[in-house]
Swiss-Prot record:
Its cofactor is Mg(2+). One of its GO terms (molecular function) is magnesium ion binding. NCBIfam families: pyrE_Therm. This is Orotate phosphoribosyltransferase. Homodimer. Catalyzes the transfer of a ribosyl phosphate group from 5-phosphoribose 1-diphosphate to orotate, leading to the formation of orotidine monophosphate (OMP).
């Protein structure tokens, strides 16, 4: 599966000067919503991701995603794997479980995102699950932005990767984009201003 081509064909592989949620800057941004707006394509990607997880023998009961970006990817993964789906969301900047969702003691979860960069949001969701007695047995995403080690792709992790090394992480593709701290961003130094994805229709 050529994930890069899928993103480009969907108009989801953006080039410019972007302000990421981490506060860092990048010349490239993956707008997964453009890929997932096609239910047939979203289903195909989720089926592929579920097959990868099954191949590695990971047993799980449910899927959890951090809102907002991970919800569509996580829901589709749960559908493909025939599992329950829930999501966490930030309340006053604290990742929380709301809307009547419950976690059973010992319930095994895959935490799923659309894109994982350092894995910070996915890790926050995992901590919520574990604090309620659940067990996170792995992480998944459509794509990895090159920082975290992907079990099925064989790449190495980078120092700022936040996902735990003792839990497998699965993805359909790996995008190695340069990410810059604002004070060291060459795009800023050239006079360009970073925009937050979505602020200008992206």
């Amino acid at each position: 599966m050529d994930l890069e081509k899928i993103y480009k064909d969907a108009g989801a592989y953006l080039e410019g000067h972007f302000l990421l949620s981490s506060g860092n800057h990048s010349q490239f941004y993956l707008q997964s919503a453009k890929v997932l707006e096609d239910p047939a394509l979203a289903g195909k990607l989720a089926d592929e991701l579920a097959a990868v997880i099954e191949k590695f023998g990971i047993k799980f009961d449910s899927v959890c995603s951090p809102a907002l970006g991970g919800i569509l990817a996580g829901y589709e993964l749960a559908r493909a794997a025939k599992k329950r789906f829930i999501f966490t969301e930030r309340v006053e900047k604290v990742m929380s479980l709301r809307r009547g969702f419950e976690v059973k003691k010992g319930e095994k979860f895959i935490v799923c995102e659309d894109i994982i960069t350092t894995g910070g949001s996915a890790l926050e969701a995992a901590h919520v699950i574990e604090s309620l007695g659940g067990e996170v047995v792995g992480f998944a995403a459509l794509a990895n932005r090159g920082f975290c080690k992907v079990a099925n792709l064989g790449n190495d992790s980078k120092p700022n990767a936040k996902l735990p090394s003792d839990k497998p992480f699965f993805a359909l593709g790996n995008f190695e984009f340069e990410i810059y701290e604002p004070e060291h961003c060459p795009l800023c130094k050239s006079g360009s201003k970073a925009i937050k994805p979505g602020s200008r229709g992206n």
